[in-house]
Curated annotation (Swiss-Prot):
This is Melanocyte-stimulating hormone receptor. GO terms for cellular component: plasma membrane. GO terms for molecular function: melanocyte-stimulating hormone receptor activity. The gene is MC1R. Glycans are attached at residue 29. Residues 64-72, 141-163, 212-240, 301-317 are cytoplasmic. It is found in: Cell membrane.
Length: 317
């Protein structure tokens, strides 16, 4: 497969447009109009991927080591870390292969490169879908633990969690294979966009409802102890800020990528859209950043997991 410049990506199935030149500034589109291009150096991209890789490997190792962390909630967190690991790993592999091909250090036939491209595309797409699914699964798990606290352990059992996890992985791999095989069809890209929006709405509805319940609970405690109302208001503000950060990070990191896919369908030849297409690698970098942030939000806030992580690190030395 011929390479088209230093930033040519193997992930061509989801990006039918050229990527950015190695600078930050104004570049011209095909009509000569200026476009703002933001280039992500390969070194920075690989470094972020490596940080994500190490971070998520530690999460998986810590959960696997401690049997106390083998509950459904931590199973979902472990699978989120594993899918994030695959997202960063597949993108790192793709970038490394591109650099080796362009340097002439990896000589192979075009058919082999094409097969490698298809494999990486399926791996990347399926791991992205899994990451989104497990973010939704964690939200559902927390929702059930709050609204059905007394029946939580009978509703969210370990066998059910394992079946849900297996279903997510199988469905993601199968759908990704179909998506990559029929990536030229607009319906495929629209399905991905709709899936992202569905996950965003699901998480927003569940977390907003959980925040409302938490505020009601805090208000009840305030009345019981005859404390002043500002304490409840302060709790509500902190909860709203936490919710805004959680959903904001999710939308900021994933939104641009799916906006790109939507624009590929809606305005592939429009001047403004063509300028946005040039920043495709930036959108992938934001997803890599999300794989770095996810453990900080969902895993490292657990004291039990952090203690196990310290044990893992001490044993490795």
């Amino acid at each position: 497969m011929p390479m088209q410049g230093a930033q040519r990506r193997l992930l061509g199935s989801l990006n039918s447009t050229p990527t950015a030149t190695p600078n930050l500034g104004l570049a011209a589109n095909h009509t000569g109009a200026p476009c703002l291009e933001v280039s992500i150096p390969d070194g920075l991209f690989l470094s972020l991927g490596l940080v994500s890789l190490v971070e998520n490997v530690l999460v998986v190792a810590a959960i696997a080591k401690n049997r106390n962390l083998h509950s459904p909630m931590y199973c979902f967190i472990c699978c989120l870390a594993l899918s994030d690991l695959l997202v960063s790993g597949s993108n790192m592999l793709e970038t490394a292969v591109i650099l080796l091909l362009e340097a002439g250090a990896l000589a192979t036939r075009a058919s082999v490169v094409q097969q490698l491209q298809n494999t990486i595309d399926v791996l990347t797409c399926s791991s992205m879908l899994c990451s989104l699914c497990f973010l939704g699964a964690i939200a559902v798990d927390r929702y059930v633990s709050i609204f059905y606290a007394l029946r939580y352990h009978s509703i969210v059992t370990l066998p059910r969690a394992r079946r849900a996890i297996a279903a997510i992985w199988v469905a993601s791999v199968l759908s990704s294979t179909l998506f990559i095989a029929y990536c030229d069809h607009a319906a495929v890209l629209l399905c991905l966009v709709v899936f992202f929006l569905a996950m965003l709405v699901l998480m927003a509805v569940l977390y907003v409802h959980m925040l409302a319940r938490a505020c009601q609970h805090a208000q009840g405690i305030t009345r019981l102890h005859k404390r002043q109302l500002p304490a409840h208001q302060g709790f509500g503000l902190r909860g709203a800020a936490t919710l805004t950060i959680l959903l904001g990070i999710f939308f900021l990191c994933w939104g641009p990528f799916f906006l790109h896919l939507m624009l590929v369908v809606l305005c592939p030849q429009h001047l403004t859209c063509s300028c946005i297409f040039k920043n495709f690698k930036v959108f992938l970098t934001l997803i890599i950043c999300n794989t770095i942030i996810d453990p900080l939000i969902y895993a490292f806030r657990s004291q039990e997991l952090c203690r196990t992580l310290k044990e893992v690190l001490l044993c490795s030395w």
